[in-house]
Amino acid sequence: MSDFIASKEDDYSKWYLDIVQKAKLADYSPVKGCMVIMPYGYSIWSKIQSILDKKFKETGHENAYFPMLIPYSFLEREKDHIDGFSPEFAIIKDAGGESLAEPLVLRPTSETIIWNMYSKWIKSYRDLPLKINQWANVVRWEKRTRPFLRTTEFLWQEGHTAHATEEEALEETLLILDVYKRFIEDYLAIPVFCGKKSEKEKFAGAVSTYSIEALMQDKKALQAATSHYLGLNFAKAFDVKFQDKDGKMRHVFASSWGVSTRLIGALIMVHSDEKGLVLPPRIAPIEIIVIPIFKKEDEINKKILDYSDCVVDALKKAEFRVEIDKDVRSSPGFRFSSAEFKGIPIRLEVGINDVLLNSVTISRRDKDRKFKYQISLDSLISKVKVELDLMQKDLFQRALNFRILNTKEIFRSSKDSYETFKAYVNDYSGFVLSCWCGSLNCENIIKNETKATIRCIPDDFKARDLTGMTCIYCSSKAKYFVLFAKSY
């Protein structure tokens, strides 16, 4: 175990906070519940942003920006929406030394301000579909906060789309869910379950919500992304109508969807270890760190440094994200540990022996410290690419193996009962696949007795036959296979 961070097994929460602070991802701000995202943490968010932004544009979305100050009356127009968010509102009642005629709410989410504008912009079927994304901050007055996972203010993207038909809006909702799934699995190397939320767990103001659920190393679930089908709810609340091809006036159908800096928390909790942060290569701000191993002689050090610069130049020319650590005051061991703590995927060591042999020594962040070998400069680019690709795949497979190991099926039978289910969730946690009758009462009782919620009705198990299956709690006829878990 590192001297610098808590043991993951002994104190998971402190281990997580140690990595956040000591890897310089974020720090606490003077405002309770808020965080300062430090440059290294923000560089991860910037990478997430750039990849997703490209994917949104490829699917026909444009970026815009809407005010963070929302008239309170806008939020009152959609009853379920205000009921769901009002406990978290931050409200401004005074400004400029005077009381405001109407209170303003700091943006908890932007459906209302955006749909107010859509009522001005959408008049004809020619204006549809309208597909806008916004990169912004939001404020939700959370009582229990933790950096990246749940903070009073956080960064996110939120997409808001308007469509002529219900089919188009539903297609958009599921399209974006798939974009998120592919991004989280392919770039963050986090295996996920996708599925529909229960009525209790859906977004306030949505007809239906679809979520992406991941399993952290402490066996708690984390909601990594959501996509909502809003139906006509916001179009009716803000009277957004269009004239169709037959000249009839009709309300538009809607979707909204988003991910946030919570994804950085997921990266930490899925991949990191007691040496610090572990970042999948495709999302790492720095893919490769070159560390010259200096000697006492200046002449030798100059040769090592010149050679190291050539290595860096070759890697940059091949478009790798690479940095060099030229710190002559710190020992190689200290610099190795520093690179490990930051989660840099590949470390290249350059000593005088490497210079003489025209080689470098390569090691990987996700491997044991004994894993290292020399490669010739001629094969540098190909070998680095191979190791980066392998690390990306290995991290995903390791996380998938962990999820498989910690996903248990418990159904009512002669062997298992609700008591079996309850004991397992309370003692062990992880994902539990079970059956549910659809009753809110059963859902509430299970949550109260186990602290586990229905994470989603998973797509992976839609094809399974429910014939003869009964609700894990009440033994009534089952309507759904569902995933239960304790969660963040």
Curated annotation (Swiss-Prot):
<dbReference type="Pfam" id="PF09180">
    <property type="entry name" value="ProRS-C_1"/>
</dbReference>
<dbReference type="Pfam" id="PF00587">
    <property type="entry name" value="tRNA-synt_2b"/>
</dbReference>
<dbReference type="GO" id="GO:0017101">
    <property type="term" value="C:aminoacyl-tRNA synthetase multienzyme complex"/>
</dbReference>
<comment type="subunit">
    <text>Homodimer.</text>
</comment>
<dbReference type="InterPro" id="IPR002314">
    <property type="entry name" value="aa-tRNA-synt_IIb"/>
</dbReference>
<dbReference type="GO" id="GO:0005737">
    <property type="term" value="C:cytoplasm"/>
</dbReference>
<dbReference type="InterPro" id="IPR006195">
    <property type="entry name" value="aa-tRNA-synth_II"/>
</dbReference>
<dbReference type="InterPro" id="IPR017449">
    <property type="entry name" value="Pro-tRNA_synth_II"/>
</dbReference>
<comment type="similarity">
    <text>Belongs to the class-II aminoacyl-tRNA synthetase family. ProS type 3 subfamily.</text>
</comment>
<dbReference type="InterPro" id="IPR036621">
    <property type="entry name" value="Anticodon-bd_dom_sf"/>
</dbReference>
<dbReference type="InterPro" id="IPR004499">
    <property type="entry name" value="Pro-tRNA-ligase_IIa_arc-type"/>
</dbReference>
<keyword id="KW-0648">Protein biosynthesis</keyword>
<dbReference type="InterPro" id="IPR004154">
    <property type="entry name" value="Anticodon-bd"/>
</dbReference>
<keyword id="KW-0963">Cytoplasm</keyword>
<dbReference type="InterPro" id="IPR033721">
    <property type="entry name" value="ProRS_core_arch_euk"/>
</dbReference>
<dbReference type="InterPro" id="IPR045864">
    <property type="entry name" value="aa-tRNA-synth_II/BPL/LPL"/>
</dbReference>
<comment type="function">
    <text>Catalyzes the attachment of proline to tRNA(Pro) in a two-step reaction: proline is first activated by ATP to form Pro-AMP and then transferred to the acceptor end of tRNA(Pro). Can inadvertently accommodate and process cysteine.</text>
</comment>
<keyword id="KW-0067">ATP-binding</keyword>
<keyword id="KW-0547">Nucleotide-binding</keyword>
<dbReference type="GO" id="GO:0005524">
    <property type="term" value="F:ATP binding"/>
</dbReference>
<protein>
    <recommendedName>
        <fullName>Proline--tRNA ligase</fullName>
        <ecNumber>6.1.1.15</ecNumber>
    </recommendedName>
</protein>
<dbReference type="GO" id="GO:0004827">
    <property type="term" value="F:proline-tRNA ligase activity"/>
</dbReference>
<dbReference type="InterPro" id="IPR016061">
    <property type="entry name" value="Pro-tRNA_ligase_II_C"/>
</dbReference>
<keyword id="KW-0436">Ligase</keyword>
<dbReference type="InterPro" id="IPR002316">
    <property type="entry name" value="Pro-tRNA-ligase_IIa"/>
</dbReference>
<dbReference type="GO" id="GO:0006433">
    <property type="term" value="P:prolyl-tRNA aminoacylation"/>
</dbReference>
<dbReference type="Pfam" id="PF03129">
    <property type="entry name" value="HGTP_anticodon"/>
</dbReference>
<keyword id="KW-0030">Aminoacyl-tRNA synthetase</keyword>
